Amino acid sequence: MLRLLVVASLVLYGHSTQDFPETNARVVGGTEAQRNSWPSQISLQYRSGSSWAHTCGGTLIRQNWVMTAAHCVDRELTFRVVVGEHNLNQNDGTEQYVGVQKIVVHPYWNTDDVAAGYDIALLRLAQSVTLNSYVQLGVLPRAGTILANNSPCYITGWGLTRTNGQLAQTLQQAYLPTVDYAICSSSSYWGSTVKNSMVCAGGDGVRSGCQGDSGGPLHCLVNGQYAVHGVTSFVSRLGCNVTRKPTVFTRVSAYISWINNVIASN
C-alpha cells in the first residue's frame, strides 16, 4: 500500500517507512523566480487569528476565478487570494488582496483518497482583479491534451524548500520535466496510485514540490507558449524529493469541460 502527502501547508502528518502520497508540497531544489515571471500564480491564504497565513498556491484563470487543488479548500476556513505576490513577508507594492466568495470543489473529490483523483477546485472571487504586468490570466491547455515524456515544465510556489523545512519567503521555481503515464504508473515509480487524469513531473531525487505548493501550477512549454497543465496534488510521504516518486499533479486538460461549465453556471 502507498501513502501520499498532499501539499497544503496547513496539514501536519506523521512519517512512515511505507510510501504513501502526501498532499503538502513546496518547491524543493528550486531557485527564486524572477519577479513577474509567473503572473498567473496566486497565494491562497487563510485567516489565523488576526493575521493571514499562506497555505496553497493557485492559478488565476479569469479575473474573478482561481483554480487550485480540492484538498486546499475542503476545510471550514476563511480564505483570501493574493495576486501580484512575490515576497510573502513584505509588501511588494504589486499585490491585490481579494476575498473568496464561493468555493466549487469537484463533486467526485474524496478527502480520504487523494489517489482517486479529482483534486481540483475553483474559487469565485468577491471581485475581479485588475490585470497588469504583475497579474495575468493563466493559459489552459486544450481538452484532452497529453504531454510527451520529458516535456519541459516548471513548478512554482512558496512551499517548503526541503522536506521538514520552512516555507519559502519568495516565489520559487524548479524545472520538472514530465514523466509519462506509462513510466509513472510502473511498479518502480508510483504504480496504480497514479491515474491517467494526473500528470507526473520530476522524480530525480533533487527537485520536487513540497508542503505549501499544493494547488499551484505546473507550467509547461508547448509550441512556444507556457500553459498550466497541472495543479500540484501530492508527493511521497517518505519525502518531497524521493527518486522515482515524481510530484503528481491533477491533469488540467482532463477537466476543461468541468471548468468551463462551473464558470458558466456561477
From Swiss-Prot:
Its main location: secreted. It holds the Pfam family Trypsin. Keywords: Calcium, Disulfide bond, Hydrolase, Metal-binding, Protease, Secreted, Serine protease, Signal, Zymogen. GO terms for molecular function: metal ion binding; serine-type endopeptidase activity. GO terms for cellular component: extracellular space. It is found in: Secreted. Binds 1 Ca(2+) ion per subunit. The active site is at residues 71, 119, 214. It catalyses: Hydrolysis of proteins, including elastin. Preferential cleavage: Ala-|-Xaa. Belongs to the peptidase S1 family. Elastase subfamily. This is Chymotrypsin-like elastase family member 1. It comes from Sus scrofa.
